[in-house]
Amino acid sequence: MRSLLAASTFLRSGASPLLRPLSRPLPSRLNLSRFGPVRPVSAAAAAADKSRGGGGSAMEAQPSYPGEIHVIVGPMFAGKTTALLRRVQVEAGTGSRNVALIKSDKDNRYGLDSVVTHDGTKMPCWALPELSSFQDKLGTEAYDKVDVIGIDEAQFFDDLHDFCCKAADRDGKIVVVAGLDGDYKRNKFGSVLDIIPLADSVTKLTARCELCGRRAFFTLRKTRETKTELIGGADVYMPVCRQHYLDGQIVIEATRIVLDLEKSKVIHAFK
């Protein structure tokens, strides 16, 4: 039975933390809260790690086999994070591969030290502002030993395309990416769609419409905030079907007009 590589441990050098194999299988309901946090290495430790063998030509760094890229997309509450953890288990195989998880440090809903599903299950991760800093944070020696990289909330990483190309094509990593393909306006969100041409597989998940129970492909924002990046959960967003997405836009626009009129009346009353 396949096992999940999830626990944090230090390499023998003591320089860098790395997620190592576990012997227990992933249950049907994920329960990963027992794992301790992954702690980032210091800049000094990373520099020392580089000096031990981080250099080398591009030819020397070329892996003996190419990597892979697997993409998981869908609206909010579609189970993308759960699918990410399950896919990581599959790619981990029988326990012979090392895995590291990354998420954007913009996603602070459940803390920055774990990837957390909406039902509260978690797994330790690296929270980073950009993916390009991952190798430096982990250390070259530890990075070379990572076989599988999972990326959650991938829409927040501007350098997603470049990182995936480098990790899979040059470094031979298996990269599993989970993120929103569209924003609350149904427009492209971040660079997730840009890596689909690079992908070995693409999985489109759906949620259940919160209003009728039908399949939900879209995310409806319930507030008046208009900026694209607005971190939130069920208090801000809900998954909806096509009909209720369209109905919701009408309601939101009507509400905006009414509120603007009321605001205008209040302003004029004080003049």
Curated annotation (Swiss-Prot):
Active-site residue numbers: 153
Keywords: ATP-binding, DNA synthesis, Kinase, Metal-binding, Nucleotide-binding, Transferase, Zinc
Binding-site residues for ATP, renumbered to this chain: 74-81, 152-155
Chain residues that bind substrate: 184, 237
GO molecular-function terms, A-Z: ATP binding; metal ion binding; thymidine kinase activity
Pfam family name, one: TK
Matches recorded under PROSITE patterns: TK_CELLULAR_TYPE (PS00603)
Positions bound to Zn(2+): 209, 212, 241
One biological process term in Gene Ontology: thymidine metabolic process
Enzyme Commission numbers on file: 2.7.1.21
Enzyme category, top tier: transferase
Record protein name field: Thymidine kinase
Domain of life: Eukaryota
Reaction(s) the record says it catalyses: thymidine + ATP = dTMP + ADP + H(+)
Family: Belongs to the thymidine kinase family.
InterPro entries in the cross-refs: P-loop_NTPase (IPR027417), Thymidine_kinase (IPR001267), Thymidine_kinase_CS (IPR020633)
